[in-house]
């Protein structure tokens, strides 16, 4: 069951993490165990060679998984990443990047998922990440 809509999650991220405005993220959609987050193209995300940098892709993957988890559990700001592993598969274009996050397992204390990243308009994956999140005990 989805507990937060894309608009609610987008508003929460921009309220709780003001730096999201700088990264130009937007929550586009959420469904059960799924979220799509877009990082709008900005020259600040480029590395030498004119490609989106690895740290920018990692931050987007982390944010997309956070969104997918919060969509399922509600507003739990203290859920934190405990592991992130990413494979860079091909050079991303200098364009918006789309992150599709899937929650594979959602437990009481841990969530595990993966994120596929794509340059906007290109069906070939540019990176794939697996993540584990710690979910704090509700009081």
Locate the predicted segments by residue:
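Hot-dog-fold acyl-thioester-processing enzymes
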Residues: 40-64
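Non-catalytic linker/capping segments at the edges of enzyme domains
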Residues: 1-38, 44
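A generic structural signal for short beta-strands and their flanking turns/coil linkers
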Residues: 23, 33-35, 54, 76-84, ...
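HotDog/MaoC-like acyl-thioester-processing domains
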Residues: 3-4, 91-94, 98, 104-139
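Hydrophobic beta-strand-centered segment that forms part of the acyl-chain substrate-binding groove
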Residues: 67-98, 103
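Hydrophobic residues in beta-strands and at strand termini
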Residues: 39-41, 88, 135
